[in-house]
From Swiss-Prot:
Gene3D superfamilies: Dihydrodipicolinate Reductase, domain 2, NAD(P)-binding Rossmann-like Domain. Belongs to the acetaldehyde dehydrogenase family. The keyword Manganese does not apply. Keywords: Aromatic hydrocarbons catabolism, NAD, Oxidoreductase. It comes from the Bacteria. This is Acetaldehyde dehydrogenase 2. It comes from Burkholderia lata (strain ATCC 17760 / DSM 23089 / LMG 22485 / NCIMB 9086 / R18194 / 383). Signal peptide: none annotated. Pfam families: AcetDehyd-dimer.
Amino acid sequence: MKKIKCALIGPGNIGTDLLYKLRRSTVLEPVWMVGVDPASDGLARAREFGLKTTDKGVDGLLPHVAADEIRIAFDATSAYVHRDNSDKLTALGVKMIDLTPAAIGPYCVPPVNLDAHLDSAQTNVNMVTCGGQATIPMVYAVSRVQPVAYGEIVATVSSRSVGPGTRKNIDEFTRTTSGAIEQVGGARKGKAIIVINPAEPPLIMRDTIHCLTDGPPDVDAITASVHAMVKEVQRYVPGYTLKNGPVFDGNRVSVFMEVEGLGDYLPKYAGNLDIMTAAAAATAERFAEQMLAATAATA
């Protein structure tokens, strides 16, 4: 079966974990890995897998986009450089999947709003943040039952799973996640907190979600909605687990999640990486299926 060729920008923790997932895809073929450090472990690993690599950043990829038929690019670098990367590649007709908190394109949380993006001509979609991917489905599970006045999430991740790019983007993480809690999750006001836990051995990703509903919560409907949404996320993140809840206290609905990774590049405790890369891969696969269908229709 024909596959859509893609490039990965940023050979760090997220980019390398994503590479493992793309190599298993039936519709995506990773052909380029882009970095800036010639000694990068991620670039070396990509070469071992047979990818073409450059340590000259996106500028090193641009001359090859047309010849190598790159249709989709994943940016796993930093919010500070994403706009420049995106402008250069979308000008060549490449669809960008943004794994930084830059959020210059619309937010995408696959089980909530991916279908809406398939029907639009977006050239850039933003995968929010690891905390957003883990928690926004739960906020939405409540808000689709009844209005949510306030949604607050706390994402706790192991220090060892957090690379330098994420550490530089903590402010962007909180702003982007808070915005997506409102725009995608459906809360009128959103707040996001990230806790980087240095404990050894490293702890698995844990997420706490609190929603304040307008009026008394519909216990049965919200409980059913939360359980249904957990199953939706588990289709691409099998380690997404409801540990407790929903717990009801007055107008407050609390949900407690745990995210275990597949252990592709980093150990299973790094569920924060896994949910981000799995969501990006799932999103790109839907775009690829759409591209392949369009190609078949014109053939």
